[in-house]
Amino acid sequence: MRIAVVIPCYNVEKYVEDAVRSVWSQEGVEPDVVAVDDGSTDATPRILEQLVAERPHHLRVLSQPNRGANAARNAGLAETSGEYVQFLDADDRLLSGKLARQAALAVRSGRPVMVVGAYRKCWPDGRTQEVLPSGDDAWSAWVGLQLGTTSANLWQREALQAAGGWKEDQASSQDYELAHRLFIHGGTIVMDDTLGTIVNRRPHGSISAGDTVGNMERYILLRARVKEHLEALHSAVHVQLIARLKQQMFM
């Protein structure tokens, strides 16, 4: 199976080389790797140039004005090939065997829209936390906030493109916004509970982290859309999920 790896990059001079090399060290796969420089103002472009010079057939670099991570992901998606796509944030890294294992799991599981992976969160002060996925199906995992995180998962290209890709103006809840569109069209998932990704929590956080009101509004509106969809299905299977969504929305 052909796998694409898209690495959005913005001012990640301390991390990006480790991210790229973690992809190069994957065994059993030869991914199509594209790094998208999203208008970096630090040494990120120079480091990417050096990596391309080192292995020109194993990395391509796209450059664009700063438009945000989702726009960079979509740009990389459009320029790569592969049945499944790994979106790797440039401050994260993959552990050995992650791509081959999840690709094989996808084949065995009937090619779901997403392989949900386990990961380890690491903070600058040395704290760590391992996060394992769980859930009986796509919607229960969505409602239970058990859909991994961007870098831990493997995404089916055809489903991504059919859903319209990443929503570029979505400032928070980005993974869950995309997943809800995939699942509305009947997408299924499979869980990979083997640790496959290191997710680094950068000390300065993200732009959206300080927008508490906006984040809460997006959180509630997204759950309202999912509740409406599940209610329209008129299935007893979803009664408990709908009740849980109402609790999350403070209803």
Positions of predicted regions on the chain:
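Conserved donor NDP-sugar-binding/catalytic core segment of glycosyltransferases
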Residues: 97-129
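Acidic metal-phosphate-binding loop of nucleotide-sugar-dependent transferases
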Residues: 92-93, 170
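Short, acidic, metal-binding catalytic loop of nucleotide-sugar glycosyltransferases
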Residues: 21-30
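A conserved acidic beta->alpha catalytic loop
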Residues: 22, 37-46, 65, 89
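Acidic helix N-cap motif at the loop->helix transition within catalytic regions
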Residues: 14-17, 42-51, 93, 97
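Short aromatic/hydrophobic "clamp" motif used to bind/position activated sugar donors
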Residues: 85
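Conserved nucleotide-sugar donor-binding catalytic segment
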Residues: 117, 135-219
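Glycine-rich, basic loop-to-helix element that forms the pyrophosphate-binding segment
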Residues: 64-80
